[in-house]
Amino acid sequence: MSLRRPPLPRLLLNNVSCMRNAQQILRHVNVSLHDGGALVLMGTNGSGKSTFLRMLAGFSKPSAGEILWNGHDITQAGIFHQYKLQLNWLSLKDAIKDKFTVLDNVQWFEVLEGKQGGSLPALELMGLGRLAKDKARMLSMGQRKRVQLARLLAIDRPIWLLDEPSVALDGDGVKLLEYIIAEHRKKGGIVIVATHLPIQIEDAMILRLPPRFPRRMTLVDMLDRGG
């Protein structure tokens, strides 16, 4: 009787260190994510969360250690080409064209992916179905973020890298975000979130980034010290 080897993690950070502007952000991080896994990067503004996400996306290399996808180093040219096709990236820049309709702003990305038919249902799920034919310039900041989330659903890649996904969302929008993350994970998708705001993601691993700069003393701090 032969023993089965445990499955490789889909994504493995092996003793990874990350630097920005010659400053260490994280040192010797070890994380393994299997299908359906989630990682939350917590930290204040300026702590390096976006830099860390960009490293996971392959835009920069670790200062030490390695990032493995299916057991292969993502910095290798042939591997990176395959790896990047697995990624769905949501950044603080929404890339929404104001002159296009709301539907066009999702459909264009779906067509580039070689897919069709998912854009309108994605917008409807995000509560924007009635605005599909409106120009995107009419959208509020929260609605623009919902358009970005609709793109995630329409493109439907397995690994989501989400940079501050709840910023500009109201309470209902945050609940929708948490719902689509949970549904993506049920299908075996992986979610990595960088945030300074609370978000409910069941069984997620938490990685806390130390503040890059000491917090400035406020009037409340001074009064506390004086008391």
Segments and roles (model prediction):
Residues 149, 188:
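Hydrophobic anchor residue at the start of the ABC signature
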Residues 93, 98-114:
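Q-loop/switch helix immediately C-terminal to the Walker
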Residues 135-144:
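Conserved ABC ATPase signature
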